[in-house]
Amino acid sequence: MDDQSRMLQTLAGVNLAGHSVQGGMALPPPPHGHEGADGDGRKQDIGDILHQIMTITDQSLDEAQAKKHALNCHRMKPALFSVLCEIKEKTGLSIRGAQEEDPPDPQLMRLDNMLLAEGVSGPEKGGGSAAAAAAAAASGGSSDNSIEHSDYRAKLTQIRQIYHTELEKYEQACNEFTTHVMNLLREQSRTRPISPKEIERMVGIIHRKFSSIQMQLKQSTCEAVMILRSRFLDARRKRRNFSKQATEILNEYFYSHLSNPYPSEEAKEELAKKCSITVSQVSNWFGNKRIRYKKNIGKFQEEANLYAAKTAVTAAHAVAAAVQNNQTNSPTTPNSGSSGSFNLPNSGDMFMNMQSLNGDSYQGSQVGANVQSQVDTLRHVINQTGGYSDGLGANSLYSPHNLNANGGWQDATTPSSVTSPTEGPGSVHSDTSN
């Protein structure tokens, strides 16, 4: 221990016994008779050593290099190194059982997979652009969707550029700091025992510290991509963007089948082709429409009347055209006094079938004035051409009374035929079906 004390005193530049170092060698200690007087001197020397340690940071680079060179050239330096190795061997037992490698962070792996799937990280192979193209194709591929697709790709490219720029800055800072620490540890390994394995462990610790910054960068990038997808590729937003023509077609089918507004698969496919949408979108639209109609029957009755008026006008024009065609082609025009009959066209048959629904008749007060005038016009045309009585008078086309007590839809009964109340020789016979 005396050798170790003398070695430390020599390296510090001051002898613990109160004597300065001369020529790199410490002077012999004083006789044992002066131990009482040397107590204060030792305290003062320890204070001087601490002062020198505290002033190391104030030294210039040349002074530090000179002291480092003197330490490396000192003859007691190997002995100091061996002592430090023994101390480390005793105190280093507690850290040997520590885990060498930590498992990969699952959250970081999820972020990496998401960025790779969206085309942000890794080589650009489509990623989110392919998703945008699929969404545009599913929604019909209109010009508006093409514009949104191009906007989505532009913003996704911008997010990708920002991500890679910040990732390069992160990697550069991490590499610079890691290189600095490794050089520092290699330099210190000349004075104190530091193994290459310990340097690798320190590098791993540095990378784990920096991984929190990397995780924050990837998390913010994933949030930006999710916001971008919700803005451009959200299915709910696409459902609200049906064209006016598609909405008209769907509403017309709904109100013309109000007794049973559940289209078959063939009808859904036909409506999807007409509206340039998918079959699933048609199913979703009818489901939402049924729910809204049952909740607000009074509100949607006015809309039903409008579509009923449109159907009535179409049927009236079809009947008038058929009658005019018969008058043109036949030598004698049938009237109410003649003995003869003629068949109505399909469109007229369909309209005549609207006389009653589920066996119930509806008053004309349920239909607006415009609808009533169209019904009167149609009845007048039929009476003039076929001797038809007022069996159709003042009947509403659509009615909200198709819901049962449980809020469900009643199945419409299909009338077998629609005939005149008085079957004279000039009556009209028409077999119809739903």
Curated annotation (Swiss-Prot):
Chain segments carrying region Disordered: 20-41, 326-349, 405-434
Compositionally skewed regions (Basic and acidic residues) per UniProt: 32-41
Primary site of residence: nucleus
A Pfam family assignment: Homeobox_KN
Keyword list, A-Z: Activator, DNA-binding, Homeobox, Nucleus, Transcription, Transcription regulation
Region (PBC-B): 130-234
Residue ranges of domain PBC in the record: 41-234
Region of interest: PBC-A: 48-127
Subcellular location: Nucleus
Any one GO molecular-function label of the UniProt entry: RNA polymerase II cis-regulatory region sequence-specific DNA binding
Top-level taxonomy: Eukaryota, Metazoa, Chordata, Craniata, Vertebrata
Name under which the protein is recorded: Pre-B-cell leukemia transcription factor 3
Protein family (similarity comment): Belongs to the TALE/PBX homeobox family.
DNA-binding region(s) from the entry: 235-297
Cross-referenced InterPro entries: HD (IPR001356), Homeobox_CS (IPR017970), Homeodomain-like_sf (IPR009057), KN_HD (IPR008422), PBX_PBC_dom (IPR005542), TALE_homeobox (IPR050224)
Quaternary context: Interacts with PBXIP1.
Top-rank taxon, per record: Eukaryota
Keyword Membrane: no
The encoding gene: Pbx3
